[in-house]
Amino acid sequence: MTSRWLFATALGAAVAGHAGPNPFAAGVRTTDPLTPAAEQKTFILPAGFKIQLFAAEPQINKPMNMAFDARGRLWVTSTLEYPFPVKPGTKGRDSVKILEDTNGDGRADKVATFADGLNIPTGVYPYKDGVIVWSIPNIWHLRDTDGDGRPDRREKLYGPLGYERDTHGMNSSFTRGLDGWLHATHGFNNHTTVRGSDGTEIRLQSGNTYRVRLDGSSVQQVTWGQVNPFGMCLDPRGNFYTADCHSSPIYQLIPGAYYPSFGKPHDGLGYAPRVILHSHGSTAICGILFYDDNLWPKKYLGNLFVGNVMTSRVNRDTLQFDGSSPNGTEAPDFLKTTDPWFRPVDLQLGPDGALYIADFYNRIIGHYEVPLNHPGRDRTRGRIWRVTYAGKTHPKLDLTTPAKAVAELSSPNLTRRQLALNHLADIHGQRAISALKKQSAHHLSAWALHRLGKLTPAELATLAQSPQPLARLHAMRILGALSQWKPAQRELVMQGLVAADPHVKRAAVEALALHPAAAHVKPLAEATEKFLLFDSLQVKGSREADDHLIHTLRISLRNQLRAPGAFAGIPNLPANLNRDLITRAALGVATPEAGDFLIRQLPRLKGDPTPVIRHAARYAADLDPLAPFIEKQFASNLLEQARLFNAMLDSARERGRPLSKAIRAWAGRLAINLLRPVTSADSARRLTDGAQIARDLQLATAADPLRKMAADSSVDTNARAAAVDALGRILQPSAFAAVVKPILGSHTTPASLREAVVITAAALPPLQSQLTEALATAPAGQQLKFARALAAAKPGADTLLKTIALGRAPATLLLDQRVKEQLPAALRSQAIKLAANVELPNANVAKIIAARLKDFRAKGGDTKRGSEVFKLACAACHQRDGEGGNIGPQLDGIGSRGAERVIEDVLDPNRNVDLAFRYSIIKLKNNQTLLGLKRREAGQAIVFADLAGKETTIPKADIAKQTPTTRSLMPDNLAAALSPADFNALLAYLLMEK
C-alpha cells in the first residue's frame, strides 16, 4: 500500500530457522494460496486467544474497509475490480456486504449484498437507513427507504473526487467523531477537490485527513500531510489515530498540524510529533485499532494494533503518556502467520468484544512494486477473521430504546459506546432527551445533548467543573465545537488552560484554536512559555516532554495571530513575556502583518534567522529593512549573507515580486565581495556563491572577476562552472563566446567544466562550431551528457543533428529518452531518420542485470565503500535511516528485497514509475528546456527537483509549457556510471538495511 520502493522486514521468529529466500520479503509471494481452513491453522497468537473465520470467499471478495452498525452487524466494502477502476458510465462488480452472526457461533451465517455495481469502494459508514460509502468517483449515501435491504436512493454527497492517479490512495477509513462529523483519510498521489453544498472547499494532494457533514453540506481539512494514511480510529478521549505508510506507522492527529510527506514543506511550525520511533519493519501499514474494553488481559488495555500487509502480521504497541502525549513502545507482534498471503488491511473492535481483521488475501499487495497487470494478482479471495480471548464476548447489542442506548454509553467497550452515542443523536433524537438529561454529567450524554441542541450552558459548566478529568476534557471539546462563546464559556476554557491535568489543558488549547481572537494571544503565550522547549522536534532521537501539547500550543497561538488586530496588540503585552514564542508562531501566519512583525523581531532573535527572513520576504509589505540588518549582523560572514539572500530570492519568486533596489544593491555588494580572491578553506564556496548571486542578478559589474575565474585553472572546477553559468546570463553571446572558446578547445579542461560550458552555450549561435568539435571528441559517457544539453535549445539541437549526420557523433545518442523529449518538435522527424535502424548497445537490460547479479554473488562488496558511494550517488534524493534527501522514496528496509530485486530497481528505474516520481519537461519562455520533478507550487512559483536532486524555484510566469513523462528522475545509466567494484559496494550497503 505504498509507493515504488516498498521494503519489508524479515519474517522473524515464525520462519527464522528456515533456509532459503524469505517468503515474506517477496513482492510476489512464491507460495500457493491456502483454503480458509488451512490458513486458519497458520496463525500464531498469544496464549488464551482464539481466531475464527468470520467470513470468506465466495461470501465476500477482497475486503477493504469495515464498520459496525447499531444492530451489531458488520458492513464491509468488497472488491473484484481493484486495482483497475471500471470506465465512467460502466457498472462495476464491487459491493457493500452486510455480515451478521445470527446464532452466536462467531461466524457470519447471514450475508446480504446491500449495494452492488460499485467501483473500488473503500471507506464505509452505516448511517440511518443505509450507508455512506466511497465508490469511484463520489462519496455516496445509499439509502434503503422502503426496508427491502437494498438501496432505492443513491445520493451523491461529495464528488467527483480524484482517483485517476492511484486507486489504492483514495477516500477511506471513515470514522465518526464525537461531534458528529465523519472523518476520512485521503491517500497517496491523488489530486482531489472536495466541496460542500454550503460553499466550503478543500484541495487535497496525496496524504491528508479531512471531515465532512453527513448530509453533504460542509467539508473541513483536519490535518495536512502523511504519505498514504489507510486506517483511522478513535480513543476514549476523542483523539484520532491514523496508520500511515512511509512517514511513520502511527500518528495521534493534532488538528491543524502538518505531517511529513514526499516533497511537502510544513506550515512554518514544524512537523507534528510522532507516536513511535520504530517502523515495525515495513512501510506497508494498514488499519489501526485502539483497544478499550475489559475482555482481554489488562496489559492490552490502551494498546494500539496495526495491520502490516508486507510482513503479514498484526503489530502491537503499548502507550505511555508524557503528559498528554502518547509515547509508543514496540511490543511483541500480536498475530503472526506462516502464510505469506495473509494481508491485514483493516482492524475493527466489534461490539461483541472481538477483534475483526479484514484479510485482503493475495499473492501481491504492492501497488507500484509489482505491475498492476501482473497475472499473479488474486481478485477473488478474501477473508475476515475474528479474534477473542478465553471465549469471552459481550451480549448482543440492543439500542432499540433511548434508555437502552443511554445505558450503553457506560459500556466498557469503546465501539458500543460510540454506536450508542451516534444512535441517540441520529435515530432516537428528541425522544432521547429525557433519558440523556438524567445523566447529563456523563460526557457522552453531554455530547449527544450537544448534537441535539439541548445541552444547556449550566449543564456544560457542570461538566467542565467535574472532579473527573475525562469529563472536564470532553467539556473543553464541546466548548470548542460551539460556534460562539458567551463570556462565562470563555472563562471555562481559560480555567482549562491552566488545569493540572495535561489532557484537559490540551483540550482547552484546541478549543482556543477553534475560536481565534486577539485577546487570546496573551493567555496562550503565557501557557506556551511554561512548556515550550526551543529545540526543534526531531524525527529520530529523544523527544520533548509532552511534545503533542507543545505543538498544539503553537498551532493555537498561530491561529490567534491570524485574528484581526492580533499583531497590533503585541506591543501592549507584558514586557516580561517571551516574544520568541510569538515569533515562532508567526512563522505560520501568511499575512503582511506577520511579515512586518517578523522583520521587527530580527534584531532580538535568537538562533537561525533563516526561517524568519524567508517568511518575511514572502509576506512583509516592506522588505528593505532586511538588507541592512543582514549586512550588519553578518558583516564578517559573507557565506551566511549569501545563504540568507538565496532564501529571500526563493521567497520573492514565490511571491511573484521583483527584488527592491535596496536589496539588489546589497546583493550586488555581496557578490563582488564574495568574488574577491582569498586564500581560505571556504574560498571555493565563496566564489561559487558569488557567481550564483551575480547570475541571478545579471550583475554586469561582476563580469571581469567572473572572466578571470572561468579562465583560471587553479580555481575550483565547480566555481569555474558557476562563473561560466553566470557569464552566460550577463554577457552578450559574442563576448561570452570569447571567454569559453579556450575552455572548450583545451583538452586539459575538466569534464564537468566542459559540460557546464555546453549547457550554457547550447542556445548561442556563435559557439556552435566549438560545440560540434567538443561533441565529436568527447568520450562516450560525456557525449550523452553533451547531447542532452544541446537538445534543450534550437541552435544546440541543430548542432547535435549536424554532427551526427556528418558521422562525427553516434546516432545512438538520439535514442536516449531525455534527448528525444527535449528536441524541438521541428527537428524530430530529422532525428528519427538519423536514428533509423540504430539499436542501443545496452538495450538488453535483462542481460545487464543478470551480469551484475552474477558478479555480485561471486565477489560481494565493501559496505564501508558502499556507504560512500550511496552518499555520492543516492543521498541527494533518497533517505536511509533518516539521513539523505526526500526527493524520492525512502530506502529503509530495502535489503529485505534481496539482491536481484534491488539490482532491477537500480538499473531499470523506469520499469514501473509511480506518478508522483515521474519528471516533467519544462519549456521556458526563453526557449530553454529543463527536466525536473514537480515538488510543489509555492505562490507564484513552482519548485522542481532537477536530475541531481537539487530543488529549483521557477516563477510560473517564466514557464511556457509543462509536459509530464512516464519516466523516473532516477538516472538509468548507473551501470555505466559506477565501476563494478563501486556498484557491488553500493549493493552490499543497501542490502544491509533490513
Language model segments and positions:
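Bacterial N-terminal signal peptides that target proteins for export
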Residues: 1-7
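Bacterial N-terminal signal peptides
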Residues: 8-16
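Beta-propeller domains with acidic blade repeats across secreted/periplasmic ectodomains
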Residues: 18-405, 415-419, 423, 474, ...
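C-terminal capping alpha-helices of c-type cytochrome domains
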Residues: 54, 129-131, 137, 831-844, ...
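Sec-exported extracytoplasmic/periplasmic mature domains
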Residues: 119, 144, 214, 410, ...
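C-type cytochrome heme c attachment motif
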Residues: 182, 354, 382-383, 448, ...
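C-terminal structured "cap/appendage" subdomains that terminate the fold
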Residues: 361-362, 535, 781-785, 792-801, ...
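Long, ordered, helix-rich scaffold segments
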Residues: 375, 379-381, 387-869, 887, ...
